[in-house]
Amino acid sequence: MKLPIYLDYSATTPVDPRVAQKMSECLLVDGNFGNPASRSHVFGWKAEESVENARRQVADLVNADPREIVWTSGATESDNLAIKGVAHFYHTKGKHLITSKIEHKAVLDTMRQLEREGFEVTYIEPGEDGLITPAMVEAALRDDTILVSIMHVNNEIGTINDIAAIGELTRSKGVLFHVDGAQSTGKVDIDLQALKVDLMSFSAHKTYGPKGIGALYVSRKPRVRLEATMHGGGHERGMRSGTLATHQIVGMGEAFHVAKEDMAAENLRIKALSDRFYKQVEHLEELYINGSMTARVPHNLNLSFNYVEGESLIMALKDLAVSSGSACTSASLEPSYVLRALGRNDELAHSSIRFTFGRFTTEEEIDYAAQKVCEAVTKLRALSPLWDMYKDGVDISKIEWAAH
């Protein structure tokens, strides 16, 4: 077993060797290096053929038409293109947008930008289980609502929203529905023929593909129109200009193909690993699971260890690569905005650690990690006066601390 152990698969995943092999065939002079937009020679034709094959592979995983897949630089760009693209195209129909307080920053900051441009945004508060229900969305709808954007699987707590039910609601009201699917590909079945979803963002690097490439599903029936945010040579039917990165795209296609093949077996294996880990730490007192116990992916276990400061715990777990919050905001010492929105107090939000498991996690690593967590929590609590007070039966929430 090699140290440190990687348990941060929701931040990024390593590229699968099968994917790396396919990518390497698209780089060198002997390989498939042409520009897919070059129409006049075989180098361009071959590159275009590979790009279209990858488009089919991505579409196959989510049961979409390949013509509905638009290549982008990642899920952040897909979120921006979907939300700004819809807002700017349909602004004459209405200026109201709906999202939730626990979306990824790529959605929240895009919404904030649109607010500066004069749009109105309603931010739905999730339940304590971290879920956004159709009833919550319905309560936020107005006559001038043009778009609802709700994530499929939450990146911090791993909860799965019922996007089928939310889609039924939005479609019946004539409101467009965007879903951030960055964390759900390869973990949850997605059938875009059945789901009433108009736009969906995808990322390769959360699904054992390369970084720097993603896609946006843009429904053809019913047709969704977007205003482009990137202008140039009119690539991707005018929605996203820029020379297509053949090697990245081939990598994403292969990664989604592998995900489709392996998903059923892999989910069972990861559920077993997640259960194995939790069984070994659940004896710790004052341990809380963040997010719904039932509607969640097994890949994510977000735990709060009360009376232990999360950053101290991460330092103590030097052989484990884990995080407190999402990778995009983990440099900030503010408590997780996602956990705060769930109603967790500052102390519990600060004492949370996200363990995320994946394709290359082993039982041996799980056992080692669980043992280290138990040791570190016990040791840090032994140093904590608050833990002593709790053990003595003092209700710490009732204490009035004097200001210095």
Swiss-Prot record:
Enumerate the Pfam families for this protein.
Aminotran_5 (PF00266)
Where is this protein found? Cytoplasm
Q: How is this protein annotated for GO cellular component?
A: L-cysteine desulfurase complex
Instruction: Give the top-rank taxon of the lineage listed in the UniProt record for this protein.
Output: Bacteria
User: Residues bearing N6-(pyridoxal phosphate)lysine?
Assistant: 206
The entry's active site is: 328
Which E.C. number(s) belong to this protein?
Answer: 2.8.1.7
Under which main EC class is this enzyme filed? Answer: transferase
Q: Which GO terms describe its molecular function?
A: 2 iron, 2 sulfur cluster binding; cysteine desulfurase activity; metal ion binding; pyridoxal phosphate binding
Cofactor(s) the protein requires to work: pyridoxal 5'-phosphate
Q: Which UniProt keywords apply?
A: 2Fe-2S, Cytoplasm, Iron, Iron-sulfur, Metal-binding, Pyridoxal phosphate, Transferase
Which residues are [2Fe-2S] cluster-binding?
328
Pathways involved: Cofactor biosynthesis; iron-sulfur cluster biosynthesis
Residues annotated for pyridoxal 5'-phosphate binding in this entry? 75-76, 155, 183, 203-205, 243
GO annotation, biological process? [2Fe-2S] cluster assembly
Q: Which residues form a coiled coil?
A: none
Q: Which reaction does it catalyse?
A: (sulfur carrier)-H + L-cysteine = (sulfur carrier)-SH + L-alanine
User: HAMAP family attached here?
Assistant: Cys_desulf_IscS
Protein purpose: Master enzyme that delivers sulfur to a number of partners involved in Fe-S cluster assembly, tRNA modification or cofactor biosynthesis. Catalyzes the removal of elemental sulfur atoms from cysteine to produce alanine. Functions as a sulfur delivery protein for Fe-S cluster synthesis onto IscU, an Fe-S scaffold assembly protein, as well as other S acceptor proteins.
What quaternary arrangement does the UniProt entry report? Homodimer. Forms a heterotetramer with IscU, interacts with other sulfur acceptors.
Q: Please give the family membership noted in the entry.
A: Belongs to the class-V pyridoxal-phosphate-dependent aminotransferase family. NifS/IscS subfamily.
Name the record gives this protein: Cysteine desulfurase IscS
